Every structure is written in structure tokens, then in C-alpha cells.
């Protein structure tokens, strides 16, 4: 087991220095963008369509599972709680490091479907 691969009980908080958080975040993004990760997410997106309920049922769990596979190498539990703990840790570093903030924003884009513009967007209001 490498020095980066630690296991921590689910109830134990994992604390990583900024550089290691950046490294883990980079690995998560790479996993989501890998051919396997992309295929899993694309399948979930296609099956979800524009239905937010289906996005929550299909896309979100697929993205969380991909994150879990990476984050357990950094001592986070291999469950949803581990992903939430990592998200809180990332949030705590966002204001300190613009690169982490940008990476975090990119990560969120995998979870949140693009929002369509309302049909009236960009049109001026009718005059009375």
C-alpha cells in the first residue's frame, strides 16, 4: 500500500493538505473524463433525458461511484459519506486556492445538467 493509500473508518474524518486535495480532485476529474467514466456518465445522461428525477436516480449515483473509486485511495470511505466528506474538504479550500475552485466548478458540471434557457430569454417584454 502506498503512502497515499490509507484507509480510515467511515466515522473518522480525513484531513488532507491542500496539495493532496488538489491531486485527489485531479484524479477524480480524470476518472470522470476517462473513456470508461465518460461512457458510464453518457449512458446515464441518455437514460435520464431532461428529467431531473431520472438525473438524480441515474447520473448522480454513477458520478458518485466513480468518485468513490478514486477517493478510497486517499482514505475516504468507499460510500456516499466519503464523497460528501471530500466535497466538504474541497469547499474549505476553494477560497484559498483558485485552481481548486476551478476544479471544483468543473466537477460540479458533471452532476448538474445544463439548464435550458426559458423560451422568453433574451426577448424584450412587450410594451403596453
From Swiss-Prot:
One of the GO BP terms on file: post-embryonic development
Compartments in which it is found: Cytoplasm
InterPro entries: P_C10 (IPR026317)
Keyword list, A-Z: Cytoplasm
Record has Cytoplasm as a keyword: yes
Alphabetized Pfam families for the sequence: P_C10
Gene Ontology terms: cellular component: cytoplasm
Family as reported in the entry's similarity comment: Belongs to the UPF0456 family.
PANTHER family xref list: PROTEIN C10
Protein name as catalogued: Protein C10
Source organism phylogeny: Eukaryota, Metazoa, Chordata, Craniata, Vertebrata
Amino acid at each position: 500500500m502506498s503512502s497515499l493509500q490509507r484507509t480510515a473508518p467511515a466515522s473518522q474524518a480525513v484531513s488532507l493538505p491542500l496539495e493532496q486535495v488538489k491531486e485527489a480532485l485531479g484524479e477524480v476529474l480524470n476518472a470522470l473524463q476517462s473513456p470508461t467514466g465518460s461512457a458510464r456518465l453518457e449512458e446515464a445522461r441518455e437514460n435520464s433525458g431532461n428529467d431531473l428525477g431520472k438525473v438524480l436516480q441515474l447520473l448522480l449515483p454513477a458520478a458518485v461511484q466513480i468518485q468513490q473509486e478514486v477517493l478510497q485511495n486517499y482514505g475516504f470511505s468507499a460510500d456516499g459519506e466519503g464523497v460528501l466528506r471530500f466535497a466538504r474538504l474541497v469547499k474549505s479550500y476553494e477560497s484559498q486556492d483558485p485552481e481548486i475552485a476551478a476544479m471544483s466548478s468543473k466537477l460540479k458540471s458533471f452532476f448538474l445538467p445544463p439548464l435550458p434557457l426559458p423560451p422568453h430569454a433574451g426577448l424584450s417584454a412587450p410594451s403596453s
